[in-house]
């Protein structure tokens, strides 16, 4: 993992959670995140669009689907699903039965139970290439 502090980023609009999470990951890795100008969105970003945004910044990212969460992928951007709505958070830590997340909807980092995380997690996550290989 990077030697940088955990970075909390608050999303600017209802549809910016993915971009806020990507920015948090970039800053965690000590990377500059230059978001290109964009029109007002009427929907959120797909994981593929976030993958492409990382690529446009010159950073290699990987998207995975899994039925069980692998703590070796931390830190990573994950997709949650709650009441039919998608939401992105960054997973920054793990301890017995708890997952540490950065939630851009509130702009802070906190712990949730692993049970709650598993219930909400869609099985999708995005990982930036290791800093040493960037």
Residue ranges and their predicted role:
Residues 1-132:
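Conserved active-site-adjacent core of cysteine acyl-enzyme catalytic domains
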């Amino acid at each position: 993992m990077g030697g940088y502090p955990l970075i909390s980023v608050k999303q600017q609009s209802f549809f910016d959670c993915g971009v806020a999470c990507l920015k948090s990951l970039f800053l965690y890795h000590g990377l500059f995140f230059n978001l290109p100008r964009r029109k007002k969105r009427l929907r959120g970003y797909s994981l593929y669009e976030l993958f492409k945004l990382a690529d446009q910044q010159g950073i290699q990212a990987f998207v995975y689907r899994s039925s069980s969460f692998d703590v070796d992928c931390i830190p990573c951007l994950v997709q949650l699903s709650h009441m039919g709505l998608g939401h992105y958070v960054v997973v920054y830590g793990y301890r017995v039965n708890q997952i540490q997340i950065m939630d851009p909807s509130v702009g802070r980092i906190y712990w949730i139970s692993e049970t709650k995380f598993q219930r909400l997690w869609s099985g999708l996550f995005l990982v930036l290439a290791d800093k040493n290989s960037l």
